[in-house]
Structures are given as structure tokens and as C-alpha cells.
Amino acid sequence: MLVNIRIDFKIADIETMEKSYAKLDMINAELHEKLDILEEVTLKTCNRYEIYLLIDEEVNIPTTTFIVEKNDMAINHLLRLASGLESMIMGEDQILGQIKTARKNAIKNKTIGPKLEKVFTKAIHVGQTIRKNTHINEGGVSVGSGAVELIEEKYGSLKGKNVLIIGAGEMGTVVSKALLEKETNTIVVANRTYDKARQLAQELDGEAIKFDEMNNELVNIDIVISSTGAPHSIISKERIAFLPEEHLHDMIMLDLANPHDIENDVQELGVKLYNLDDLRYVTDKNKERRNKEAIKAEAIIEDETLLLKESLKQMEITPILSSLNIEAEKIRKQELDKTLHMLDLDKKSSKKVDYLTRSITDKLLYNIINNLKEAAANNDKDTIRNAKKILLEYN
């Protein structure tokens, strides 16, 4: 059974999600204690936390906080997710990279096996296919472009503004590149690892600073965009209270981190603070066109889901067929060698006998293999289970 347990921006705001992470970790730990978890992949982004588990038995997970989907529904969700249909900004590309990273991490941690590998590889393939064959990701569709659009809605033109990017990771990079299209004055990048800040700043033709130099730089900054992976906040009312009152009232901060980087109390100083929740309401100028493209994407997902389901069903009998063929070939070869040893045959005749034994073996296995394939296609678990017992466990 494939199980997906998740919380995302569709059912919770950022604060609720932040508080729910530990609870989801606890549920996962309890499942590991009670059940034999065969495979696992974890996907964690700024606006979703998802766990995919492969379990060799039925399981009921009572929860009102999280979404729980199984088998076909879990597969369909992952394919939709990889395609950008489940994103806060429909069609954005960032989620596809995040799914690739989740798969790589699972490979590194040795928690992924053949089935989830097939599922995630298919999801990545579907995401790439949809972006290639539809226009769903065209027209400024990324969290980065959405963040910039939000700032423009709230602040007006970014022309001549000084921007501080805190965090040179994936999100910081996406937002920074969206800013390149605007006529900002200066983009300053701060990161705990200075080399990463310098690398991103070079791409932006901006300036890199060390993390502990931020206070000195804030006096020149109009817009702060923060997206670090820090477990605690890095900007608070106390930290920026030294700035002139007029400057604080003109300053806008956008917190794209989860858990949050910027404390809400900065608003008490007059700072305009926005977070990921506010991105939901960004005006989407291309929404109607992308909805049309989503219909095309849904058709691709439907076809690819059917192919994946059939492939997963056939995987159930792969070890049985492998064992059957290996054992049959082993016996055929043993008996052939005995016979050829007793008979004084020339090379041509030996080949004919070899061909004969192969033909007999293939014909004997033909109906068995076809029946197993039919059982897999019909999801006949009893037949497959019995075949495994007979051909695998008793050998």
C-alpha cells in the first residue's frame, strides 16, 4: 500500500503548518514502530510537508490535521504536484526540482526502493512532459515572480529600490532572478555561508555581505526578502529598532521562510510585513490561460497514471517470474548437460537438442507466466500471494 500523509497551504496557513510539522513527524515515527515500512520519501518545502510510505499491509491513520491519501489517489496527487497543478502559483517550476531533491535524498538515505523509485521517476517525467507540451509554466509563474508581484502591488514600482535578500538557497535564488527584470538600484545578498552569497550576488550583479554585517546594511535597504532554513527567527523588533522611524515606515519585508524568519512584532515599528499566506492572493494575470493549459495537463496525467498503475501491478510478479525462469533454466541446463554427456553428438545435433529443451521449457512456462500476468493486471492479490509462497518461500 502506498500512503501519502501531508499538510499544505490549501488546508493550513503558515503558522498552522509550522506547528504541525512535529506532529506529522510523530505520526511517522509511530507508523515506523508499529508497521514494516518498506520504502519512504519525504518532501518538505516552504508551503507543504509530505511523506510517502510504502507499507505491506492495510493501515488506517485517523487524523483531522493532515490529508491522507492511498494508492491511486496518492499517485495522482504526486503526478499533479510534479506538474505544477497543486502549487500555490499554478504551473511554477520550482516544485519539480524539489521533488527531484526529495528523490535524491531518499536514495542517499537508502529509504527508497524499486516501487517508489518508479513512482517518483514517473512523476518527474510527467512534470517535464507537461511543461514541454503545454504552456502551463509560461507567463511569470514562480513563487519568485509571485513574490515580486506581491511587493509591486503593495509597494508600487521597484525602480531605484535597494533590496536585501537573506538566504542564498533555492527560494532566495528564484526571487533574486525575478528581481532582475525590475529596475532596482542594488540587490544585496546575505547568507550564513559567505561563498554562496558571493556566488549569487555575482549572478545578479549585486553585492554580497556576511550574515553579521546585515545591521550595517539595513540603513540603506527599502525591501527585505528572507528565505533561510534557520530553525529560529533572524529579524525581530529588537534587532531593527535602531533604524530611523521614517525609514521603518517606508520599509517592506517579505518572509518566505517556514519556519518564519521575521517576527510579527516588526509591524509595531511601522514595517509592512508579508509572508507566504499573502502570496495566495496575488493577482494572477495569466490565470485564465493557465486554467486552459491545466485541462491539457490533466489529460496527460490521466494517461500516465494508467500506465504507471499497470507497471506497478506487473512489478508484483517480477520476482516470481525471475525465480521461475532461473529455476527452470537451471534444471534444463542440468538435464541437457547429462544427456549430451551420455550421447556422442556432433555440434550441430547438440544445438538441436539444446533448442528442443528450450522450446519445451518455454511451452511449459507459457500458461503459468500468462496467468500470473493476468492475475497482476486484475490485482488478484490472493493468486500472487500463493504464487510467491510456492515459488519463492518454498524454494
UniProtKB/Swiss-Prot annotation:
Catalytic EC class: oxidoreductase
Q: Name one GO biological process term.
A: protoporphyrinogen IX biosynthetic process from glutamate
- Originating organism: Methanosphaera stadtmanae (strain ATCC 43021 / DSM 3091 / JCM 11832 / MCB-3)
Q: Which reaction does it catalyse?
A: (S)-4-amino-5-oxopentanoate + tRNA(Glu) + NADP(+) = L-glutamyl-tRNA(Glu) + NADPH + H(+)
**Keyword Secreted attached:** no
Question: Where along the chain is substrate bound?
Answer: 45-48, 87, 92-94, 98
Assembly, per entry: Homodimer.
Q: Give the protein's recorded name.
A: Glutamyl-tRNA reductase
What SUPFAM superfamilies has UniProt attached to this entry?
Answer: Glutamyl tRNA-reductase catalytic, N-terminal domain, Glutamyl tRNA-reductase dimerization domain, NAD(P)-binding Rossmann-fold domains
Q: What is known of its domains?
A: Possesses an unusual extended V-shaped dimeric structure with each monomer consisting of three distinct domains arranged along a curved 'spinal' alpha-helix. The N-terminal catalytic domain specifically recognizes the glutamate moiety of the substrate. The second domain is the NADPH-binding domain, and the third C-terminal domain is responsible for dimerization.
Lineage, top-rank taxon, reads: Archaea
